Amino acid sequence: MGEALSNLEIARGAKLLPIEEVGRSMGLREERHLEPYGRHVAKVDLCAIEDLSERPKAKYILVSAITPTPLGEGKTTTTVGLGQAFSHIGKRATIAIRQASMGPAFGIKGGAAGGGYSQVVPMERLNLHLTGDLHAVTEAHNMLAAMIDNHLYHGNGLGIEPHSISWRRVMDVNDRSLRNIVIGLGARTDGVPRQSGFDITAASEVMAILALASSLEDLRERLGRIVIGHNREGNPVSAEDVRGAGAMAVILKEAIKPNLMQTLEGTPALVHAGPFGNIATGNSSVVADLIGIRTADYLITEAGFGADMGAERFFNIKCRISGLEPDAAVVVATVRALKAHSGRYQIKAGAPLPEELLEENPQDVLAGAENLKKQIENIKLHGVPAVVAINAFPTDHPSEHKAIEEAAKEVGARCAVCRHFTEGGKGAVELARALEETIEENERERRRGGGGSFRFLYPLEMPLKQKIETIAREVYGAEGVEYDAEALRALEGFERAGFGRLPVCLAKTHLSLSSDPALKGAPRGWKLSVREVRASVGAGFIYPICGQMRTMPGLSAHPAAERIDLDGEGNVVGLF
């Protein structure tokens, strides 16, 4: 047996369809809807939302997961594999995924195109620049930062308190040395000195706005609502106030159009927006879903991290804006992650898996499956049926898969073993059939007056504090919530400012249901600690901060960037 091909080698060996042909398979017209960026990528004009509105709606499927290990459990690969699998059973699918950030691609996480024989291609394009959307977000964000400092320099007519300015600068590189900086040093003509810093572009509120805007007009309005700080009277100061929103909208005019690509098997893939999964929604764009929902029998999208994170935000933030209701959700699980949730193993990013983790041990899988059960419950809290996808690895044992199936059955979820990484769509046919049956069964039950109907976890009228406590108790399993004095003051201020009807997006670790990354499984008897509360008014949510949140990552001792290069023919090498 030869050495296994890398993701890049597999992707490079694919025979790709012209992007116009991919568009035609979705009902998109080349001359009206597609703006090609080379042979295999195109922007999709937003007029497609209206043009396709009379077509039947696809079944809407969310791909989520158990609480992941630092290695990730294969949500994107499963999303791609599932999209491909539907064609094997005579159905059409479109997938919608987030756009990759280059910071993690050159760091330790790896790419965002899937893996093995379930990838979106060309994968180098997806992971490196694509059509330049992240650069546009970076430019728009920094344009506003420049306008703020320019306003201070030219007399500060709005009376902005410099220490209150929360709008930092961004770049799409992991660079810890820029987390905290002082700007405006030098001569008086070099600006007003103040402390600031850089975040990674994916953490920008502009990226969250790009993901949640439902039209170009909505994008412009949301940009204007961004709060950058407050004045001497304590009133919020917006991007509109400093007259920066118009220029930002112009910079983002093309970036709001979703990118069309394809999988290795020719399934259409809408790739758009990439907001952080910790402090923002962690979902691809609303406009991509509004287009995709009219282009196939099934639209499959994914949400970042576990169901307590990305899925909760998908249901309570993204779906409120799009008006779309999911028909089913997938919870991706792996044997290695469930063993880790037993609390008996430690998995570290960049380090080899512990040898004992690979030994047959269904008891440890069952011990860790409490996390799986809780994440299935988190899906069902919203009236959505769940199907478990066991993302199989060669080191798994049949008894361990059986243990996962038993745990899923206990909470009323179907289960499917998936081998889409090695087999492509064929390896996820069992999952596609399980979803088809689950959706049909739920619809039959609904017609009889039973079955699940999609519902939000809380009404927008609920006070912010109560929304936080509802998510903490119902989704995370917390006993209660403890607030720092600063967090309580911020909540009161947001209610007074008229932001109380916004949904909440709790910023916490993705490595645990709790706010402590060391607590595995489904911990009980703990309290969520909220140390600070911030507002993304433009994006349209309040985000309480629980624990330490890094918005600018650093590079590891040996980042992926060390291995990435060009060969003698100008081809990228070392990229996954």
UniProtKB/Swiss-Prot annotation:
SUPFAM superfamilies: P-loop containing nucleoside triphosphate hydrolases. InterPro entries: Formate_THF_ligase, Formate_THF_ligase_CS, P-loop_NTPase. Keywords: ATP-binding, Ligase, Nucleotide-binding, One-carbon metabolism. It catalyses: (6S)-5,6,7,8-tetrahydrofolate + formate + ATP = (6R)-10-formyltetrahydrofolate + ADP + phosphate. ATP binds at residues 69-76. GO terms for molecular function: ATP binding; formate-tetrahydrofolate ligase activity. Belongs to the formate--tetrahydrofolate ligase family. HAMAP family: FTHFS. This is Formate--tetrahydrofolate ligase 1.
